[in-house]
A protein has these predicted regions:
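Conserved Radical SAM active-site core
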Residues: 27, 31-153, 157, 166-167
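Alpha-helix N-cap and loop-to-helix initiation/capping positions
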Residues: 87, 114, 174-182, 260-267
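Hydrophobic faces of well-ordered beta-strands that scaffold small-molecule active sites
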Residues: 59, 107, 135-137, 158-160, ...
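Alpha-helix-loop-beta-strand connector modules within alpha/beta enzyme cores
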Residues: 123-134, 185-193, 266-274
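Non-cysteine beta-strand/loop elements that form the S-adenosyl-L-methionine
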Residues: 152-169, 240-248
Length: 305
């Protein structure tokens, strides 16, 4: 188990939950992670933004556990139910190199925060053996400033959510009343660390921040508040991130128990998109309404791990 000056596995404080689980003894933290690194899938993924997936796919590793508790999570078998396979740091390094050999445009780490020390150790090993692809941190946006700083020199691209502004809504849907209070300064730090988006000759992102927002049914007003924050960042530093507004919400997991047991309507989503455009958030991605399909969720069958 990795142990650094920044991580004491006996009292884990990697995420904003600060649950202090004794992961050295195999205790499970709030995030569902214990002492052994777990992943559920490693494969080329073609359903990210075009500048991430490109033509050859994003080399995506889905890690088990999550620091949020989203009742609508499409990845709930791995985020909430513990699905995954225990792997070593050395094997993870081999996975990164294999994805590179398959032609991936990048290495895409999905919900990596609870495994940060393990992943950093694996990246060090893989780089020593020739890994050279951009590294993507695919995060729900709920990260401590300390964690973001520890990723410096490892993460090239932040693919981050800004899910909510309302504390009541984030408490209800993700068990995180402090979500926006944590995410806003965290995203500030991500943008400061990564800088403005940089693309290669083929239009594939090499560094920068993509800021995602998934529109939820019945909560257009909170989407407006999220977009207001995005617009404020864009006004302060034009072009500092790429906005990505998504319509793919599908009522997975326990969504129906929390008043969001339906897909977003075309009218609701059009209101969100029009608001984004009115705010000048046009230099990014607006997902088609038809994207709300279960096929966008990969099969967590331990492929590649």
């Amino acid at each position: 188990m990795p142990k650094t000056t920044h991580f004491a596995p006996e009292t884990c404080t990697l995420c904003p939950r600060q649950c202090r689980a004794d992961r050295a003894a195999g205790r499970i933290g709030f995030c569902g992670a214990g002492g052994a690194l777990k992943a559920a899938r490693a494969a080329l993924h073609f359903w990210e933004e075009p500048c991430i997936s490109g033509t050859r796919g994003s080399g995506t590793v889905f890690f088990s556990g999550c620091t949020l508790k989203c009742c609508f999570c499409q990845n709930y078998p791995i985020s909430a139910e513990g699905l995954g396979k225990e792997i070593s740091v050395g094997h993870l390094a081999e996975i990164f190199l294999d994805l590179q050999a398959q032609g991936a445009h990048n290495i895409n780490l999905v919900t990596p925060g609870q495994w940060q020390p393990w992943i950093i150790a694996a990246l060090d090993l893989a780089r020593a053996q020739g890994l050279h692809l951009p590294i993507v941190c695919n995060t729900g946006g709920y990260e401590t400033l300390e964690s973001i700083e520890r990723w410096r020199g490892y993460i090239d691209i932040w693919l981050a959510d800004l899910k909510y502004v309302s504390p009541a809504l984030s408490a209800e849907l993700s068990a995180a009343p402090d979500y926006f209070a944590v995410a806003r300064p965290g995203i500030d730090a991500m943008m400061a660390q990564a800088g403005h988006p940089v693309f290669d000759a083929d239009g594939i992102l090499q560094k920068g921040v993509i800021l995602r927002h998934l529109a939820l049914p019945g909560h257009v007003d909170d989407s407006f508040a999220v977009l207001d924050q995005m617009a404020a960042w864009n006004r302060a530093d034009p072009g500092c991130f790429l906005p990505s507004v998504m319509s793919q919400y599908t009522p997975f997991y326990k969504a129906a128990d929390h008043g969001i047991g339906r897909r977003i309507t075309t009218y609701e989503y059009r209101r969100v998109v029009n608001y984004a455009m009115d705010l000048g958030l046009s230099d990014g991605y607006m997902q088609q309404k038809s994207s709300a399909k279960e096929e966008y969720t990969p099969s967590f069958d331990l492929t590649g791990v």
